[in-house]
């Protein structure tokens, strides 16, 4: 008798995606982050659902409803901090997942990569709107500053900002619509994830060498299911350590003060995972230029397939580009640090130099080093 998982219309899809999927035998732990991101999304949707049962999206009661969740709801504090720190875990996994893709040349799977870039934008938008919901000082002023950036768009800027606000300032209408979008976007993300996987399974996974692995494939289950479970256990251990011992480590103390339009916090800054982009935004003195640089800092990922000059896919055997890659990683850490610092000397010039370096490495140096490496191997004939 044929196995039901191979014949049933629904189980057949699951079987081809997670059980009998032919997978390269040599993929390392860097390939674990896809499943970890799926786990993060599941955690965020579930905790978010339970938070939404008790949250009220009204400027008068939003802050106190979050306090009520933490104090009066059974395990509300746990759900709230799992959701807040789960977002940080989400971004840690996202950055590592994208970094893996850049290192091993996974961006040559164009459709998968582009859906991934769209997913990154969607997750960033969701996280930004979620940060506004507790209606603390940093929520309010973060929303004001970031939405205000759209006013830099010529002609329609001001109208666009007021349309997004639903009035002449960030107020009740803004909070309500942000809650609505924050609720719906994760489900759109989940749908995009399915499309992301669909395109990935058209080509099969990449591997550390960047070479074709058709000659050496193994079934996903049990080899990679058990490997993914180990990754999930490690991630959940780290998340729960954060939640139970250091719940406010990555948050801003200003957000424990209710939103007050009459009192601006001394340093308005986003959550840590946006600081690198925020530093790039601030490093350009012109408002429109800053906004364009901010968008381009993420959108540049979509250009990677066109900037690939080497005849080798992965950086595994390319020491010059490898060095540039790790300089880029260090550069992003510097940008993250600068984004959290006040706008004063020497932070301004450091931020500007780091921003120039960021774009130079990706747009100029890495493509050149790819050509040089090919010449050194006499592959440019």
Curated annotation (Swiss-Prot):
Its protein name is Cytochrome b
The text of the family note is: Belongs to the cytochrome b family.
- Give the protein's cofactors: heme b
Instruction: List the membrane topology term(s).
Output: Multi-pass membrane protein
Question: Which residues of this UniProt protein bind heme b b566?
Answer: 97, 196
The UniProt entry's GO biological process terms, in alphabetical order, are: mitochondrial electron transport, ubiquinol to cytochrome c
Pfam families found in the cross-reference section: Cytochrom_B_C, Cytochrome_B
Where found?
A: Mitochondrion inner membrane
Regions crossing the membrane:
33-53, 77-98, 113-133, 178-198, 226-246, 288-308, 320-340, 347-367
Summarize where a ubiquinone binds, as residue positions. Answer: 201
**Chain's role:** Component of the ubiquinol-cytochrome c reductase complex (complex III or cytochrome b-c1 complex) that is part of the mitochondrial respiratory chain. The b-c1 complex mediates electron transfer from ubiquinol to cytochrome c. Contributes to the generation of a proton gradient across the mitochondrial membrane that is then used for ATP synthesis.
**Which Gene Ontology molecular function entries are recorded, alphabetically?**
metal ion binding; ubiquinol-cytochrome-c reductase activity
State the signal peptide span: none
**Which Gene3D superfamilies does this UniProt record tie to the protein?**
Cytochrome Bc1 Complex, Chain C
State where heme b b562 binds. 83, 182
Cofactor binding remark? Binds 2 heme b groups non-covalently.
Q: Which UniProt keywords apply?
A: Electron transport, Heme, Iron, Membrane, Metal-binding, Mitochondrion, Mitochondrion inner membrane, Respiratory chain, Transmembrane, Transmembrane helix, Transport, Ubiquinone
